[in-house]
Amino acid sequence: MLNYTELENKNVLVVGLAKSGYEAAKLLLKLGANVKVNDGKDLSQDAHAKDLESMGIEVISGSHPFSLLDDNPIIVKNPGIPYTVSIIEEAAKRGLKILTEVELSYLISEAPIIAVTGTNGKTTVTSLIGDMFQKSVLTGRLSGNIGYVASNVAQEVKSDEYLITELSSFQLLGIEKYKPHIAIITNIYSAHLDYHETLENYQNAKKQIYKNQTKDDYLICNYHQRHLIESENLEAKTFYFSTQQEVDGIYIKDGFIVFNGIRIINTKDLVLPGEHNLENILAAVLASIIAGVPVKAIVDSLVTFSGIDHRLQYIGTNRTNKYYNDSKATNTLATQFALNSFDQPIIWLCGGLDRGNEFDELIPYMENVRVMVVFGETQDKFAKLGNSQGKYVIKATDVEDAVDKIQDIVEPNDVVLLSPACASWDQYHTFEERGEKFIDRFRAHLPSY
């Protein structure tokens, strides 16, 4: 960790605890700042809050009193806290500096950064790059939205290692100096409009990933969305990926992944399922090549890497039916990819938090859907969708009940796919919890020998 002294004796207010706020507060204390933590929820019984208080950090919870801004603190905002929260709006009015925990990770480390963002595919790309590093002599440390708090990992990473960081639009909004050596934008579609309010705001948040890059850095983008960045004043070297045509970067030709005229691997040898994952693979391969990962290590990864938990994750077979856990599909685009990944009849488990979306854009991808099992707040919307397409629709109370209900109607070689197309927060704390419940219920129905 760098000997970073700019926050020494400065007043810093961490808004929003959770995991990243907790780690940020501890780091700020280590950097010599005068730290307070504020959260709108009551944290009187929270273990992390009590731990911070034992270190001498004042925790104010249950409301957002503006008096916390009177000593002109630097604000470190948990990425999940919208800028429309009252205390953040007031801080902005007063002209106070507002950072996120990811910015701290950059300030305290000299390690080069590979940063990955996008509406879909960012977790897969981040994990795959990490696996490619692991297969080589180079060291890459996963961090960010993938589950490892960036500022925590940044304290441990060495200057000759890479930080491989997944970034959400929430995290990117608060960057000031953050500069990845290699930035990847997998794709940008409409998402999180409940947070960003407009598609333009969401797109602009994603574009923050390259705003500080120089001519010595690299930007990797989807060729078929190049219009989103072509008008920008880019300094970084820009490369593209495409599954459809030759581009300045990496592409697929005659069934092979090709970079710089060199065939890397035949796509038939890839283990990761789904047509959409070809784009994720191209982005990961290109970033790893730029970072210096040997081609042999890249190929070793591609012939063994089968994906990440909760993203089109194959969890097993019961009788002749393969089960796939795609709980991380919290929007319709991710579910489009999932439905498009199978030629067999699909029993589709879907539903969740109602964000006001309609789901008609899924209709072109429902050809192979034989049965829909619907649950959650959007249950009636999905039932209406299924009925309009002549699908057999079953209503369930939750994911576990959905798995129970299909046992008597599943037919040989049906694929059972959990791909909710919705967030999980109506019934589960996280998409991971929802996915684990699905896996547990699948296992409960396995025959015992």
Curated annotation (Swiss-Prot):
The family this protein is said to belong to: Belongs to the MurCDEF family.
Record bears the keyword Cell wall biogenesis/degradation: yes
Coiled coil: none
Enzyme class: ligase
GO cellular component entries: cytoplasm
Organism field: Staphylococcus epidermidis (strain ATCC 35984 / DSM 28319 / BCRC 17069 / CCUG 31568 / BM 3577 / RP62A)
GO terms of molecular function: ATP binding; UDP-N-acetylmuramoylalanine-D-glutamate ligase activity
UniProt keywords, alphabetically: ATP-binding, Cell cycle, Cell division, Cell shape, Cell wall biogenesis/degradation, Cytoplasm, Ligase, Nucleotide-binding, Peptidoglycan synthesis
EC numbers, comma separated: 6.3.2.9
InterPro entries the UniProt entry points to: Mur-like_cat_sf (IPR036565), Mur_ligase_C (IPR004101), Mur_ligase_C_dom_sf (IPR036615), Mur_ligase_cen (IPR013221), MurD (IPR005762)
Record-linked HAMAP family: MurD (MF_00639)
Subcellular location: Cytoplasm
Reported function: Cell wall formation. Catalyzes the addition of glutamate to the nucleotide precursor UDP-N-acetylmuramoyl-L-alanine (UMA).
Binding residue positions for ATP: 118-124
Pathway of action: Cell wall biogenesis; peptidoglycan biosynthesis
PANTHER family according to UniProt: UDP-N-ACETYLMURAMOYLALANINE--D-GLUTAMATE LIGASE (PTHR43692:SF1)
NCBIfam families given in the database record: murD
Pfam families: Mur_ligase_C, Mur_ligase_M, MurD-like_N
Catalytic reaction annotation: UDP-N-acetyl-alpha-D-muramoyl-L-alanine + D-glutamate + ATP = UDP-N-acetyl-alpha-D-muramoyl-L-alanyl-D-glutamate + ADP + phosphate + H(+)
Record-given protein name: UDP-N-acetylmuramoylalanine--D-glutamate ligase
GO biological process, one term: cell division
